[in-house]
A protein has these predicted regions:
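Short secondary-structure junctions
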Residues: 16, 79, 134-136
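Catalytic beta-strand/loop module used to bind and position nucleotide/cofactor moieties
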Residues: 105-142
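Active-site loop/lid in soluble adenylation, ligation, and acyl-transfer enzymes
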Residues: 2-74, 81-82, 106
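Short Gly/Ser/Thr- and Asp/Glu-enriched loop/turn motifs at secondary-structure junctions
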Residues: 51-53, 94, 137-140
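Residues forming anionic-ligand binding surfaces in small-molecule and nucleic-acid pockets
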Residues: 83-106
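Short, conserved acidic/polar surface loops in the N-terminal third of protein domains
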Residues: 68-71, 90-95, 110-111
Length: 142
């Protein structure tokens, strides 16, 4: 990742959308629309949103057999699938604030972690200004 990459991305048109709480499928559909818009030359997008009801979002390739469907039904937890990879993420109605950052792939570093760090740096800076000690996890996952 270079400073040129960060500078070029900062000079592009961006929009910030603060969404209301919505159900999981709608939040994922809005992320997909934002991605398609950026890919078609539209603005890059930062969305901040909440989930209603509480939702378990599955990674794109995650096996649905890993879900405790009975528990989700008993607790009123919706289940949806993200367009991105990784494992399941629980989004609580009362305690979860989510965000998505969308920009064309060609404008980002080729390495996934470099892109992640580039896009997350402003978030860490904002937490720092709020007095919150936030950083990347340095220990490998079990």
């Amino acid at each position: 990742m270079t400073e040129d990459t960060a500078g070029e991305l900062a000079d592009r048109e961006w929009r910030f959308i603060r969404e209301e709480a919505r159900d999981g499928p709608m939040q994922m559909a809005l992320d997909e629309v934002a991605a398609e818009t950026a890919a078609d030359g539209g603005p890059r997008t930062v969305r901040v949103y909440r989930w209603d009801p509480s939702t378990l979002s599955l990674g794109y390739g995650q096996d649905p057999d890993t879900v405790d469907w009975e528990h989700c039904a008993d607790e009123g937890i919706s289940v949806t699938r993200r367009q991105t990879g990784g494992g399941g993420i629980y989004h609580d109605l009362h305690g979860d604030v989510s965000y998505s950052i969308v920009a064309p792939k060609a404008e980002l570093p080729g390495d996934l972690m470099d892109a992640y760090h580039l896009l997350c740096e402003p978030i860490l800076d904002a937490f720092d200004r709020l007095g919150v000690d936030a950083d990347y996890v340095s220990d490998p996952m079990p």
